[in-house]
Amino acid sequence: MFPALYVYWLFPGALILLAYWVFAQWQKRHTASALTLTQAILFAISSIVFIVWINLWHYEQFILAFAALAVTSICLFMLYLTYPLTENKMNGRLPISIAFAAIAFLAFLTIGFLFISNNLIDFGLSRQLWAVVLLTCAAALALAIRFHRYDAAFPAVFIWFLIGVAIANNFNELLVTTAALFLSGVLIVGIIFIRKRLPANANKKRL
């Protein structure tokens, strides 16, 4: 269920977007749309814990690394929720959305890695079926974000990863490749056709 190596080039891109986001927040620091204390704390925690994750993964402390990745995902999700539903801009929610999506999918991949490395694959399901289950859960999360948060960027990142999974398997594992392509198609349809009327408070910024 692991993607082709090219997909990981998304992470340097996400870091560049976050660097621009930080610069944009600095420019807005004296305006009404300035970063709140809650947002600053959540971003700082997620950044620090992600650095910790890099070190834990490097030293093969995989379970602790997953815990750090989970904390990073939670902090980014909480930061993501502080933004209005309509603020899909480069200096607003968009960089956070892309970073959150990349970290969330990385968490799903880490779960799969832990299952394989610790021989936890059981319950009568093959490795391929477990991969399909995890990919389906990932796609369900992306669709939920698309529907409830009016966000096309989040599922787009998941499509990038899912296509990478299909390319990496190259039809050697037909079930996983087919599932990855099918779920990519579902997410594309979701991005294009999912429409829901914005609530009255859609432009309200949370603390």
Can you annotate each of these PLM segments?
Residues 1-66:
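Early transmembrane hairpin module of multi-pass membrane proteins
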Residues 1-10, 92-97, 120-130:
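Short aromatic-rich membrane-water interface segments that cap or initiate transmembrane helices
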Residues 23-30, 82-85, 190-207:
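Membrane-interface capping segments at transmembrane-helix boundaries
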Residues 52-66, 85-90, 117-124, 145-148, ...:
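Membrane-interface helix caps and helix-loop-helix hairpins in membrane proteins
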Residues 70-81, 136-139, 162-164, 183-192:
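Alpha-helical transmembrane segments and their membrane-interface exit regions
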Residues 75-84, 105-117, 132-149:
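Alpha-helical transmembrane segments in multipass membrane proteins, preferentially the mid-helix core
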Residues 152-164:
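Central hydrophobic cores of alpha-helical transmembrane segments
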